[in-house]
């Protein structure tokens, strides 16, 4: 079992209280052997301040992140790597799994650094549209020509060169 839970806190008191509560709840679970096995990989991490907590969180890129602080909205603004974030003391992970409408198919093993969870947006085909006006092609044209030349894609370079000449001759 590779599941784990990680508590990052600035409070030794909270760390102790959580450890005691986990033991109490574990004893009541019908599948306590499985849960206990998952807890073998779990950690209680004491940090000096919120900055360190966020640094660790963003480096770890959790699949699920529960933020239970007084200023959880401010903290949430600093989260850059997480699959799904649960805000405040009334928002358990199980709400996201079953009822709140967010996604349950999330990036694991730190992949939240690069990927989002699967959502309806994952199945929507997107089309991008571009229009470059004369001022725009004059501004970016030389850079495009240089990049295309460096990649030895002469036709790409010429596609811009022809347009720049057409603007000059009009």
Across the structure, where does each feature detected by a protein language model lie?
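Short beta-strand-to-turn element immediately C-terminal to the catalytic PLP-Schiff-base lysine
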Residues: 7-10, 46-47, 87-88, 100
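Hydrophobic alpha-helical scaffolding
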Residues: 8, 12, 43-46, 109, ...
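Glycine-rich, Lys/Arg-enriched anion-binding loops that position phosphate/diphosphate groups
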Residues: 26-66, 70-71
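Residues at or immediately preceding the N-termini of alpha-helices
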Residues: 12, 50-52, 72-73, 120
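C-terminal core of ALDH-fold dehydrogenases
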Residues: 58-170
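A conserved active-site cap/scaffold subdomain adjacent to cofactor or substrate pockets
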Residues: 1-40, 44
